[in-house]
């Protein structure tokens, strides 16, 4: 994520995409003063859960790495270096009026009215020449804005850098795991949840 302004990640379920992303967000906020990081998810509770993961990571950092916290609540963390991390549900006004340096959109293929949200959010992104965007999601059919951005990234027609995490990239997942998962669900469900199939 560090070398790319726009990153999009297509990843299978339970592959660590969210936890890896929020670890990067914490690093960014700690080591880049006076930055605002926004975590937006399809539900406010999900965004809050990611902020809770960041709080837990923060508590487990070695003492010499722990930044001072000026404020810590269920929706935001403010650090002594004047950086902050905020969390909210994806809605048209969730970050309106804010200056965002890093925007993280989690499970973006599952956001209702995502195209409308993205349209209303893009001015915040484009207002800063260095604003970073990280989008992660499991596939959720074709035609949605996540699918369109992903396909554009793969084809090289937009500025997003595509990253993909397949089921076999996850430690402990092998052909036996795949066969067992399909027998307990279905091929269609496997393809949707783990196969990165649109």
Language model features with spans:
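Phosphate/NTP-binding elements of NTP-utilizing enzymes
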Residues: 1-198
């Amino acid at each position: 994520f560090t070398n790319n302004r726009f990153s999009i990640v297509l990843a299978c379920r339970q592959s660590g995409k969210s936890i890896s992303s929020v670890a990067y967000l914490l690093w960014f906020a700690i080591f880049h003063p006076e930055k605002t990081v926004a975590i937006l998810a399809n539900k406010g509770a999900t965004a809050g859960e990611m902020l809770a993961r960041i709080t837990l990571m923060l508590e487990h950092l070695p003492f010499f790495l722990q930044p001072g916290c000026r404020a810590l609540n269920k929706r935001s963390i403010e650090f002594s270096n004047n950086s902050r991390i905020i969390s909210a549900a994806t809605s048209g006004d969730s970050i309106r009026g804010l200056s965002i340096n890093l925007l993280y959109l989690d499970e973006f293929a599952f956001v209702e009215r995502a195209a409308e949200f993205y349209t209303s959010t893009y001015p915040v992104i484009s207002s800063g020449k260095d604003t970073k965007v990280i989008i992660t999601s499991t596939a959720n059919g074709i035609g949605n804005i996540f699918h369109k951005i992903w396909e554009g990234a793969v084809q090289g027609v937009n500025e997003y850098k595509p990253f993909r995490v397949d089921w076999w990239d996850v430690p402990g997942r092998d052909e036996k795991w795949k066969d067992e998962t399909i027998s307990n669900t279905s091929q269609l469900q496997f393809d949707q949840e783990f196969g990165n199939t649109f």
